[in-house]
Each structure stands twice: as C-alpha cells, then as structure tokens.
From Swiss-Prot:
Residues 33-70 are annotated as: Disordered. It is a multi-pass membrane protein. One of its GO terms (molecular function) is membrane insertase activity. PANTHER family: CYTOCHROME C OXIDASE ASSEMBLY PROTEIN COX18, MITOCHONDRIAL (PTHR12428:SF65), OXA1 (PTHR12428). Required for the insertion and/or proper folding and/or complex formation of integral membrane proteins into the membrane. Involved in integration of membrane proteins that insert both dependently and independently of the Sec translocase complex, as well as at least some lipoproteins. Aids folding of multispanning membrane proteins. One of its GO terms (cellular component) is plasma membrane. This is Membrane protein insertase YidC. Belongs to the OXA1/ALB3/YidC family. Type 1 subfamily. GO terms for biological process: protein insertion into membrane; protein transport. The gene is yidC. It comes from the Bacteria.
Length: 622
C-alpha cells in the first residue's frame, strides 16, 4: 500500500540512508497505466447546475425513489445468516447488510485462524454463543444505486422497504423493491457458503414495461456503493489520526492497483511534495472520477487487518468515484453509464465479495467446486487473479510473508507468546546477517583505532575544512579503511527492515498480543498519559517506555562506536537516535521491541569485537 506507507518509508530513508542516495530501494514502482485510462475531476455542482442535471435525468427516463417516502419502523424486518466465518445481519429497510461480523475460522490446512482477537462482541443465535468483530462500523453495506453524488454515502434506496425472502438451506437472502412509478424492479440476492470467506451478490434491474428502459447513461450516471469504510474502530474514544491512517479505499483499473486514505484527497503523498516545489496547489475537487475503456477489475475498502472487496464477475463497471470530502465514509463506489434494458429484460450484475483478514490464507477456497481455478462452472467464475494485490506490500511482500511464517513457527514450536517470538526472530536475523554485521563492527573498531590521528588532524586544520577533509581521506586510504563501511551493511538490509515493519504492523497475529508490561504488541507501549494540555492537545501526551529504551540503546551503541571528529560530525552521529525516537514513538510496540533487541545484540557484538581486537593487539605487542 504505497500511498499510505510512503511517509514511513521516507523516514526510514532519512534515518538509515542519510549519507547515501538509496531511495529507489524502498518504494515499489507504480504500475504503468495504459494510455486509455482517464482521470476526470468532478466538482460538487452548484444549485443551478444541479437543477439542470435533475431536469436532464427526468428527460432520460430513469426514476429513483422519492425523498418523501415515509418509512414505518414496524415494516423493517431483520434476519441473520450464520456461517463458519461470518454472522451477517440483514435489514429489509434498504434491502441491505446492516451489520457484518467476522469470526474465527478454519484455515485450508485445518488450522484455527483467530480473527475475533480484540474486544469481540458476544452474539447469541438460536441458543448458540458466538464471538465476532463488527466490520461495517454498524453502518452496513449497501449495494444500492444512486444517481446523485450528493447522496453518497447513503442512497435514497436505503430508505425504501424491500420485501425479504430467505432460504436457510443455501444461506441466501433475496430483497426486492419497485421504483415509485413501477417501471422497474430492483432485486438483490446475497448468497453465502458455509466454509468460505467469499459470498456472492447479484444486483438485478428488471424492466417492467413494454418499452426500452435507459437505466444508466452518460447523462444519467448511476453510482453503486458496495462496501463502506471498514472497521473495526474504537468504541470507547473518538477516532484519532493514527486510527484514520489505517482506513483506505482501493481499486484495480487497467492492470494498475491504487489506494487512498478514506476521506482524503486523491493527490498522493509524493504528488503533494512535487506540487509544493512546483507551486501547484494540488487541490482536489469534492469527487474524483476514474474511468477507463477497460473497466474496473475490482474495488474495495480496507483497515489495518481487514479488507472488503467487490469483484465484478460478468461485467466491467465503467469507472470508480472517489469521495474526497473530509471524514466521508462513501467507501468503494462503482460507476455505470451504459445500462439499457429491452422490454421485460432482466439485467444482472454479479459480484464475488470477500470480507476478511488481509492475508492470502483468508482468500483460499475450501471447496474445490467453488474454486474457479479448479471448477469451470463455479459460482465465482470470472474471479480476478489479481485480488491478492488488495493486501500487496510491494517488492517486500515475499520477505514480509516469509517473516510472518517464521514468527508463526517460532510461536508454535517454542514459547506461545509473540513477544518472545520477536526476540528469538531478532537473534536468528542477527545470526543470518552475522558476516555483514561483523564487517560493520570491525570497520567501526578500525575507525576507533584511528581516533588519535583523526583528533590531531581536526585540531591542526580546524580553520581549513577543505584541507582537513583531504588529510582525513588520506589517512583512511593509507590504513585501508572505508569510512562508509559501517553504513553499507545497514543499507543492504533496509528492504528487510521495511518488510519487518509491514509484517509486525499488519499481521493480525500481533493484534491484542501482550508481552511483559506491554498490553498489545500491535499498539504503542503507552504506560502513562498526561492530562490534556490547553491549546496544545486535547488528549494528553503518552509516555512510551519501549521507545525510550530503544533510543537509549541506540545512543549507547553510537557512543561505543564513536571516533574523534569535529563538532559538526559529532552532532550528526546523534541525529539518527533522535529521528528514531520520533519515528518509533507511535509505532507498534512489536516493531520497537524488535529494534531495541537488535540494538542490544549489536552492542554485545561490538563489545566482543573490541575485546578480541584488544587481546590480539596485546599478543602482538608481546
């Protein structure tokens, strides 16, 4: 998820590669878009223009439910569908999913995949007790049309009572409602499968007249809202910036994957940097319309650990609308501008839908007859082979997946605690990269041995920086010392560090996992929060013990490897720990724990190297 993680990547570049231009190592390249892809900016229409649009829509022969429709609460009916993975509550008001719960489920190899890990709700259905996490933020998922951008995220259809028919045998729910003038019927079928994390949605438009019906056209665009902003979200406090940074929308268009934060401008982070230096305002309109002749492959919404994807199976929507208004919850909205029905014709739109964890294990089919890669006539025939890009982390994805696999094996076969798993993994990582780390330690030791001579050069040429630099480089060359030898091993490992961050930040296994005094390895280690500070912060400032320990070990390591140098260079040596404190202050404590223990191991390795060098020097002196 390039746009959402780019700030972190930039910080890591500045911290680890401050002396070297290695930016291109860190960021997965954005796939090249075809020349057929178009981006159209859509601004919120004025009142006069909106009246004209509505007039044109009436002339183009499409009707929508009236805003004056009255709803009688008793007319709203609810029903539940329970599968191994889901508990789904439906409402006849709008014919929609009103609540969507995910549960623990069985993986393809029979393993239990824990999903309801943190603050699960207790649900009693037919006398049985279940535990689930509600993902629709209790605002539901629609699959309803609207022809007005101003109605996003809630369609007028959401206020219309639908008839409800349920077939418990095959876990299907069917809703239907008529347009106010009875010219067409909207029918929605939700079908679930007991052991699968996929379900199928069919939206049908039925022409009830003996005339041709233009349901969607260039003049009368229809917007289909599938999934809204995804949860879960904290119920005991308001959302903060750290929370909202994990809520995003994504789409796959013309072979290119893109994502943006919920309710944010579609101008990306790097584009905003370019706009700053070029003087371009970069301001987005209220809505951005992405269209293409190739159509939309799939679209969805996501949060830190979960995604919801709608994959059109038998058709390609003409585009996707991005709602850029602050704090909107419009989610994934598909665009249709070419639906015409003959007399009595039924027009079906089939979707394969997935709601679950952001891991490939969740997208594996259990039943071969449902798997479109194994069964030609599967209900999910036409499923996109690129759905895994919904949680793709770029070029570091293979490393991330490998790290998660190793962590799970350590957890399984040693101590069943992810804190200890991270520590054991840090030791294994240090052993694997021992040759590089040892080269770094030896390089720093050589620099220390030259400390007296460097001090002499600095004092002698204190007022001549050019000559001081020249003499310093001559000293390095004479003693066969590479001044960047200590940095190179770290630079080589940077892609691995990025993979470690994504592994520790996004894997659901760390969610609500405690370690020693740390309550949750997926959250910052806040041991105390100050009272609110007027005019500065309304929530107080958290004290993160693990982050302080991390920067303490970083400073100690820096002092161990420091050599004589001028004051400016000495100041640079302490820039990294300060930057690291800023970066890690609000990071998941699992990441901070790993980095802290890596520092401890590096300190130990440097001490052993220094001790061995001293012993060797004494032997040579004798």
């Amino acid at each position: 998820m390039e746009d959402r993680q780019s700030r972190l990547f930039l910080a890591l570049i500045l911290s680890m590669g401050i002396w070297m231009g290695v930016n291109y190592f860190f960021f997965p390249p954005t796939p090249k878009k075809t020349s057929e892809t178009k981006e159209v900016k859509v601004d919120k229409p004025s009142d006069d223009k909106q009246d004209q649009i509505q007039k044109e829509k009436k002339e183009s022969r499409t009707t929508i439910p009236s805003k004056g429709t009255k709803i009688i609460p008793s007319e709203s009916k609810k029903t539940l569908v329970v599968t191994e993975s889901y508990i789904v509550e439906f409402s006849s008001l709008g014919g929609r999913i009103s609540k969507f719960y995910v549960k623990d489920f069985t993986g393809p190899n029979g393993e239990l995949v824990q999903v309801a890990r943190k603050d699960p709700e207790t649900l009693i259905v037919d006398g049985k007790t279940y535990y689930g996490v509600e993902l629709s933020r209790e605002k539901g998922f629609d699959f309803n049309f609207t022809d007005s951008l101003n109605e996003l995220p809630h369609s007028e259809w959401n206020r219309i009572p639908f008839s409800l028919a349920e077939n418990k045998a095959d876990h299907s729910v069917v809703f239907s409602a008529f347009s106010p003038d009875k010219t067409y019927q909207l029918k929605k079928t939700f079908r679930f499968f007991d052991r699968e994390n996929y379900f199928k949605v069919t939206v049908s438009v039925i022409n009830l007249t003996k005339e041709k019906l233009s349901f969607a056209s260039q003049k009368n665009v229809q917007y289909l809202r599938t999934f809204g902003s995804l949860g879960p979200f904290p119920k005991d406090r308001p959302l903060n910036d750290r929370d909202t940074a994990n809520f995003f929308r994504f789409y796959h268009l013309d072979g290119s994957f893109n994502d943006t934060l919920d309710g944010s401008s579609s101008v990306g982070f790097w584009s905003s940097i370019v706009n700053f230096f070029t003087g371009n305002s970069g301001v987005d309109e209220s809505f951005s319309l992405k269209t293409s002749t190739g159509g939309v492959d799939f679209a969805g919404t996501g949060s830190r650990y979960f995604i919801a994807v709608a994959d059109p199976l038998d058709h390609k929507p003409q585009g996707i609308i991005l709602d850029n208004r602050p704090k909107n919850e419009s989610g994934a909205v598909l665009v249709y501008n070419n639906i015409t029905l003959g007399p009595g014709e039924v027009y079906n739109l089939d979707f394969a839908s997935y709601v679950g964890i952001r891991e490939s294990i969740g997208m594996v089919f259990h039943d071969p007859e449902l798997d479109p890669s194994q069964t030609k006539n599967s209900p999910f025939a036409g499923l996109s082979s690129d759905l895994n890009k919904s949680f793709n982390q770029g070029i570091t994805t293979p490393f991330r997946n490998g790290i998660i696999w190793v962590l799970k094996q350590i957890y399984r076969f040693t101590i069943p605690n992810y804190g200890w798993s991270i520590i054991i993994f840090a030791i294994l990582f240090k052993l694997v990269f021992y040759p590089l780390n040892q080269k770094q330690a030896e390089s720093m030791k050589k620099m220390q041995e030259l400390s007296p001579q460097l001090k002499t050069i600095n004092e002698k040429f204190a007022n001549d920086p050019k000559m001081r630099q020249q003499k310093t480089m001559e000293l390095y060359k004479k003693n066969n010392v590479n001044p960047v030898g200590g940095c190179l091993p770290m630079v080589i490992q940077i892609p691995i560090f990025i993979a470690l961050y994504t592994a520790f930040s996004d894997t659901i296994d760390l969610w609500n996992s405690p370690f020693l005094w740390v309550k949750d390895l997926s959250e910052p280690d806040v041991i105390w929060t100050s009272p609110a500070i007027p005019y500065f912060t309304q929530t107080g400032i958290g004290l993160n013990l693990l982050a302080l320990l991390m920067v303490g070990t970083q400073i100690f390591q820096t002092r161990m490897t420091s050599v004589s140098m001028d004051p400016n260079q000495k100041m640079l040596m302490y820039v990294m720990p300060v930057m690291m404190l800023y970066i890690f202050w609000n990071m998941p404590s699992g990441v901070t724990l790993y980095w802290t223990f890596q520092n401890v191991l590096s300190i130990g390795q440097q001490w052993v190297t220094n001790h061995l060098k001293k012993t060797e020097a004494k032997k040579k002196a004798v």
